[in-house]
């Protein structure tokens, strides 16, 4: 198995980190809204595209996508994001690269996802989070199996 979690990708300078988990605190989301979340998501998927290119270049065949690709995604629908067309384009492109170069992409839900919780709100949040993960893989046009 080949794993891919290098500290820095490509030849970008230190002041331009390549990362897929740009996020924000709740107060920032409340004040700046979905527009800012959309901007951060677009930057995250652009950098995911860069990471996949880097992985292909160096022969890495596995990458785990962060759960924070779309900050505060539980608070809005994908279709409400101003940058959704570009986000979908990048995700589709990433899916094509992953299939073409046999890069396995996975994700891992957060530690608070407990489908068996006795608390209805915990289960609801878990289902929402898992749905968001599925939406990302759907936008990449990857199969509904654990073998992407």
Protein language model regions, located:
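Conserved, mostly hydrophobic/aromatic
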Residues: 108
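Alpha/beta catalytic barrel-like cores
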Residues: 1-103, 113-116, 121-124, 135-142
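Short, intrinsically disordered, charge-balanced linker/junction segments flanking boundaries
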Residues: 143-148
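Active-site glycine-rich loop that binds ribose-phosphate moieties when present
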Residues: 128, 132
């Amino acid at each position: 198995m080949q794993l891919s979690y290098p500290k820095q990708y490509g030849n970008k300078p230190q002041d331009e980190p390549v990362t897929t988990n740009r996020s924000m605190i709740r107060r920032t989301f409340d004040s700046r809204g979905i527009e800012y979340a959309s901007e951060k998501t677009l930057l995250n998927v652009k950098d995911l595209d860069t990471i996949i290119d880097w992985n292909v270049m160096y022969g890495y065949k596995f990458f785990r996508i962060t759960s924070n690709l779309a900050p505060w995604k539980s608070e809005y629908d994908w279709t409400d994001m101003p940058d959704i067309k570009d986000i979908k384009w990048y995700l589709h492109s990433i899916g094509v690269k992953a299939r073409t170069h046999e890069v396995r992409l996975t994700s891992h839900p957060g530690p608070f996802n407990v489908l068996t919780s006795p608390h209805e709100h915990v289960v609801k949040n878990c289902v929402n989070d898992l749905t968001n993960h599925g939406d990302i893989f759907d936008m990449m046009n990857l199969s509904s199996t654990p073998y992407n």
